[in-house]
């Protein structure tokens, strides 16, 4: 949680940090888009009433209509200037130290289409999915490189934000690592149910103690040691839902060549890994077969490589690429094939 409350900067791009920021600046964390429970994406009417894509004169053109009620908390309108600022920041990962430019370098022009809230975006080449464009929208102030890097460090300023909550007066306590947000009286959308939310940074063991003592309302219990520890906490309810994420091992293509990466993917016993990871937990979902679509999506298809003999299939890939077995390991050009995987956790299970 913090200290950099800019989730687009590499130093603020942490999942828990972004979740806290989303309470008071949903425009920055989810942009013009929303998703339903099936994972289908559509324009968020609080910010955008139309977002279409079509080919015009051989070029992909996006037509965007912004909600005229939408404003940042300092009164700055959500209009073409905010989209231009977003394009400027997210197409330049050297100046602004963002994680990835995505499709933003493919934007050729951003023009008014009759008014400042009706915007025409022309792409230099067809780009998909369009929902990855303006899935973050920044206040024009964020184009200031110093402010982008340092302006929100230990200063979660909601003046440049737009969302159902705002940072409370003195809401960030950098010593105790707590952030409190309250209802935003400038919010034009649906009124939030809660009057305030307090986010608190705790290490994993401290979270469990705080939950057991009634200081926290919820805590993750996704490893067996935590689950067992919390089973007997009075009035605790265990709730299980679909995680909207399919993770995997990311291998550096500079250090691990394509044949070795392919061999690992074909030869890996994913079920054995899953059984080990979730042993002792009431979890029995099927292994995900796609890194693009969730199993409940209508577009889902299991695209993972299938082999009757994984070991033989992996060996064949390596040997066709010039690897040769030496003892228990494969080598190529005198170097042993290896991949180093680091896993960080505060829990020894």
Q: Which residues does each PLM region occupy?
A:
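Aromatic- and charge-enriched surface segment that lines or borders ligand/interaction sites
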Residues: 49-96, 120
């Amino acid at each position: 949680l913090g200290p950099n409350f800019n989730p687009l900067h590499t130093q603020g791009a942490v999942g828990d940090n972004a979740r806290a920021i989303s309470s008071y600046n949903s425009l920055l964390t989810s942009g013009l888009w929303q998703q339903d429970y099936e994972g289908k994406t559509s324009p968020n009417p609080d910010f955008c009433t139309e977002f279409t894509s079509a080919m015009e004169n051989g070029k992909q053109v996006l037509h965007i209509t912004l909600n005229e009620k939408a404003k940042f908390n300092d009164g700055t309108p959500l209009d073409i200037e905010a989209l231009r600022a977003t394009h400027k920041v997210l197409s330049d990962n050297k100046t602004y130290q963002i994680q990835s430019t995505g499709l933003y370098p493919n934007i050729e022009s951003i023009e008014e289409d009759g008014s400042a809230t009706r915007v025409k975006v022309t792409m230099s080449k067809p780009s998909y999915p369009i929902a990855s464009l303006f899935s973050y929208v920044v206040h024009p102030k964020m184009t200031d490189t110093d402010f982008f890097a340092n302006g929100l460090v230990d200063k979660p300023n909601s003046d440049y934000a737009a969302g159902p909550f705002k940072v409370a007066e003195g809401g960030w306590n950098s010593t105790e690592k707590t952030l409190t947000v309250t209802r935003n009286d400038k919010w034009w959308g649906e009124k939030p149910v809660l009057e305030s939310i307090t986010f608190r940074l705790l290490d994993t063991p401290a979270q469990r103690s705080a939950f057991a003592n009634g200081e926290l309302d919820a805590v993750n219990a996704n490893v067996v040691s935590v689950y067992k520890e919390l089973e007997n906490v009075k009035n605790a309810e265990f709730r299980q839902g679909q995680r909207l994420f399919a993770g995997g091992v990311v291998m550096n293509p500079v250090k691990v060549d394509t044949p070795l990466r392919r061999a690992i993917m074909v030869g890996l016993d994913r079920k054995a890994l899953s059984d080990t990871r979730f042993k002792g937990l009431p979890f029995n979902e099927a292994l995900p077969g796609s890194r693009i679509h969730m199993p409940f999506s209508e577009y889902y298809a299991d695209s993972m490589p299938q082999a009757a003999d994984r070991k033989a299939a992996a060996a064949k890939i390596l040997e066709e690429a010039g690897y040769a077995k030496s003892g228990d390991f494969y080598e190529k050009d005198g170097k042993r094939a290896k991949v180093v995987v680091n896993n960080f956790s505060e829990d020894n299970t």
